[in-house]
A protein has these predicted regions:
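Active-site helix of classical SDR
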Residues: 107, 143, 151
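Alpha-helical segment proximal to the catalytic Tyr-Lys
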Residues: 112, 156-160, 217
């Protein structure tokens, strides 16, 4: 059955891989993007998830073209890495506002239609860093760890309405972010991963697709690591 799906930050990397995977399975997929080029073959809506009005406008456009959102993947996120003593308050709050509060904004808006339908799937894209920590990423780790508490609270709050909330925690993945690392940095990072390689975006997408499926109807409040064993789920 074709569903209305919305993926935030779905114009590149992991978000785009998820969008392509679900679209190929027959879903009506829309993605939000803040910068860059919109992907071809998908309904792309420009939206800054730190702006509540833009979030509402994006949902209205998706609802008009695809119907109420039945599957939400909160993927949009940013990094502003810096050691604590050099990290400004803006560096911290901007990352939290995008990665955590942004997820709150889109979840709250999506819940309207899901509550009426008495069903829905919400998947948050966190990070292995949220579970194991990382020097220089206190802001990012805090924002991504916050998604776990948020998802589990929502699972308890709205579970009786047939809406599931789960978290996927990817490890280092083959995206533009990892491509910015030097060969030496990559090799050093690989030594910390039991499987000895980076994740492919398609592997993250397959996990999200499962959690959004009927086969996962009895899974909620879960955190699924897709990190090659780097964090072991913690």
């Amino acid at each position: 059955m074709s569903r209305s799906v919305l993926i935030t930050g779905g114009n590149r990397g992991i978000g785009l891989a998820i969008a392509r995977h679900l679209a190929e399975a027959g879903d009506r997929v829309a993605v939000t993007y803040r910068s860059g080029e919109p992907p071809e073959g998908l309904l792309a809506v420009r939206c800054d998830i730190t702006d509540t009005d833009q979030v509402d406008a994006a949902f209205k456009e998706v609802e008009e073209q695809h119907g109420p959102v039945e599957v939400l993947v909160a993927n949009a996120g940013i990094t502003k890495d810096q050691l604590l003593m050099r990290m400004s308050e803006d560096d911290f709050t901007t990352v939290v506002d995008t990665n955590l509060t942004g997820a709150f904004r889109v979840t709250k808006r999506a819940s309207r239609g899901m509550l009426r339908a008495k069903k829905g799937r919400v998947v948050f894209i966190s990070s292995a860093v949220a579970l194991r920590g990382e020097s220089g990423q206190a802001n990012y780790a805090a924002s991504k760890a916050g998604l776990v508490g948020f998802a589990r609270s929502m699972a308890r709050e709205l579970g009786s309405r047939g809406i599931t909330f789960n978290v996927v925690a990817p490890g280092l993945t083959e995206t533009s972010m990892s491509q910015a690392l030097s060969d030496e940095q990559l090799e050093n990072l690989k030594t910390q991963i039991p499987l000895g390689r980076l994740a492919r975006p398609e592997e993250i997408a397959a996990t999200v697709a499962f959690l959004a499926s009927e086969q996962a109807a009895y899974i909620t409040g879960a955190v699924v690591p897709v990190d090659g064993g780097a964090g072991m789920g913690h």
